[in-house]
Curated annotation (Swiss-Prot):
Region of interest (Disordered), residue spans: 26-48, 77-229
Provenance organism: Magallana gigas
Residues the record lists as binding Mg(2+): E307, D309, D409
Cofactors: Mg(2+); Mn(2+)
Protein name: Cyclic GMP-AMP synthase-like receptor
Keyword Nucleotidyltransferase part of the UniProt annotation: yes
Gene Ontology terms, MF aspect: ATP binding; double-stranded DNA binding; metal ion binding; nucleotidyltransferase activity
Spans traversing the lipid bilayer: none
């Protein structure tokens, strides 16, 4: 039996359902209601349930480069909205060219940089609006409103019913689309917001319509252009994800960085440090060596490479004295050496005074930065830091338009060979995730920095803060070496969550930092064995729960010196805020 379309004479249908789908999609009701409008240049599909149109032409403006019926539907809705007199669509004027077939008119206030963001978000809202209208139609139970999943109509419908159903369906879709667009413009589409990271190629992700806003969050969306500039993920995570898995995907998506920009920044900083070392060898009266530390070098960077840490330590043999020192601190005295370069900074008892050493090292850094032969130093600016800060911080301008400057911390330090000779320090144990070679290399040395002890102590002026930057770097860098698991990924997600909490309310979160997370995560690795990639979500949930518990109790052990509570400097009010945010993620 030959099944033939009465409008375009197409006769290669395999069933009546295929013909019905063809008629409803290719020959929708005309605006005047007198019958069906013929369509041309169609081709058969692989089955009778899925009809693909080869050339789809707009009946109002003859635009014919649509890729799908959805593109045509969105085009008609946006470009040829129904007139107020009810006589049918009217052509739209004054619109500009779009990149996408589905693009519609945008508010005249949008700039070209905003268009791509707003266009994507608006298209997504349109699709969801159409789906909602169709679901509502099914819930009403009216046979005239029924639309099957594959586009076919029930065989019990008569042609008269089909025309009426098509008319109602088209009208409901147009109304639904218009409503979605109005709501999107009223609440401030994410596409209208220009984020700080746009300068380096970052694009904001659209906000799904089903995400609910809390009253506090909704206030930040009323005036989108007045929102404080922040990272991409801070905007995304201001809305509640429908489930934990999607929340994690949103976090991971926000961690991705453009490789080209990352390489540019890293190469620029490495060149800066290489040139600085050349100048330093000529100016410094102390032999210095370099340790590259920080998240970039242990491969856990979560944002753009805009912060780098470098330790410069005297290449002189020194010894650590832990006698009568609080956990995590020690005194430094001269070892067996004939070098006298540090003698001016040693007191009468033979101990190296942190403040004197720090002041002298800062002078060396400043002389090198301002030396005429150091050209890159001309693009730096000294940043103000708190007196107790152990770092000499520079703001390094890349000299490239639209590229933000980089924070570079130069930290004076002393290197001590071997592992701390104190019962308070725990040796790194091999086993679950640490192999012998990693443990051996991590315990080769440790460092001390000029960070002052926050409490009263008889030897306050002689205390140095013990730093395990070398060991931390080795352990984190090789965390997944044994089983190719997800340890580093869990750590990076926790760091991103912490950054989002800080950006959300920077006034309430000042002391809690990545160092606290690092001490927590190393202990977490020891207490959990299965970090296979398919356990990532489960491990992340357990990590958030355990972290919230530790912060609530006000105690996170220093992984290397268990008696040292690294949270002791974090105020109770700030800890309560962190706990509240962490527990909110699991709800």
């Amino acid at each position: 039996m030959v099944i033939k379309c009465p409008n375009c004479d197409k006769n290669d249908f395999k069933s009546v359902r295929g013909l019905n789908c063809h008629i409803s999609r290719i020959h929708p009701s005309s605006a005047d209601g007198r019958g069906l409008r013929p369509s041309t240049d169609t081709r058969g599909r692989r089955d009778d349930k899925d009809i693909v149109v080869k050339d789809i032409t707009c009946p109002f403006c003859d635009k014919n480069d649509f890729k799908s019926e959805r593109g045509l539907s969105c085009h008609i809705t946006r470009m040829h909205r129904s007139s107020s007199d009810g006589k049918g669509p009217r052509p739209s004027t004054g619109t500009r060219d779009r990149k996408d077939d589905r693009d519609g008119a945008r508010p005249e206030t949008l700039t070209p940089r905003h268009e791509d963001h707003e266009r994507h978000n608006s298209d997504r809202d349109v699709v969801k609006g159409i789906a909602k209208v169709q679901r509502d139609s099914l819930q009403k139970g009216s046979p005239d409103n029924i639309l099957l999943k594959d586009g076919a109509r029930p065989e019990t419908l008569t042609p008269r019913h089909e025309d009426h159903e098509r008319h109602n369906s088209d009208r409901d879709v147009v109304k639904g689309v218009a409503k979605v667009q109005r709501e999107s413009l009223q609440r401030g589409s994410p596409g209208n917001i220009l984020l700080k990271n746009d300068a380096v190629g970052a694009k904001p992700e659209s906000r799904p319509a089903k995400y609910k806003e809390s009253p506090k969050q909704s206030r930040t969306t009323e005036e989108p252009h007045d929102r404080p500039l922040s990272s991409l993920s801070n905007f995304i995570l201001s809305f509640n994800a429908p489930n934990f898995e999607k929340f994690v995907k949103m976090i991971e998506g926000s961690i991705v960085r453009p490789r080209e920009d990352s390489t540019l920044r890293t190469e620029s900083v490495n060149k800066f440090i290489d040139d600085l070392k050349v100048v330093m060898e000529r100016i410094s009266d102390i032999p210095l060596k370099l340790l590259k530390s920080g998240s970039y070098y242990d491969k856990t960077k979560i944002d753009y490479n805009n912060e780098f840490d470098f330790m410069f330590y005297a290449d002189i043999k020194m010894e650590a004295d832990f006698t009568n020192c609080p956990p995590g601190y020690c005194k430094i005295r001269k070892g067996v050496t004939v070098n006298k370069d540090l003698d001016p900074f040693i007191d009468r008892n033979g101990y190296l005074v942190p403040k004197l050493y720090k002041s002298h090292m800062f002078d060396i850094f400043e002389k090198c930065r301002t030396d005429p032969s150091f050209r890159k130093g001309r693009r730096t600016q000294l940043q103000d830091r708190k007196p107790e800060s152990p770092a000499y911080t520079l703001l390094f301008d890349l000299g490239i338009p639209d590229k933000s400057p980089i924070d570079i911390d130069l930290v004076p330090a002393i290197r001590i060979s071997g592992w701390p000779k104190t019962k308070d320090a725990r040796e790194i144990q091999t086993g679950k995730w640490i192999d012998i070679s990693t443990a051996k290399k991590a315990m080769e040395c440790f460092h001390v920095v000029t960070k002052q002890f926050p409490e009263a102590h008889p030897d306050t002026n002689l205390l140095w803060r013990v730093s395990f930057s070398h060991a931390e770097k080795e352990l984190i860098l090789h965390a997944d070496l044994s089983d190719k698991g997800c340890r580093k990924n869990v750590f990076k997600i926790l760091k991103k969550i912490k950054e989002n909490m800080k950006s959300k309310n920077p006034t309430e979160m000042d002391k809690f930092c990545s160092y606290h997370l690092k001490m927590f995560i190393l202990g977490f690795y020891d207490t959990h064995s299965d970090f296979s990639k398919d356990q990532k979500l489960d491990m992340l949930k357990k990590g958030i729960e355990q972290l919230a518990k530790c912060v609530r109790e006000g105690a996170i052990e220093n992984y290397f010196i268990p008696k040292d509570n690294v949270l002791q400097s974090v105020p109770e009010e700030e800890r309560r805020y962190v706990v509240r945010e962490l527990e909110g993620l699991l709800q």
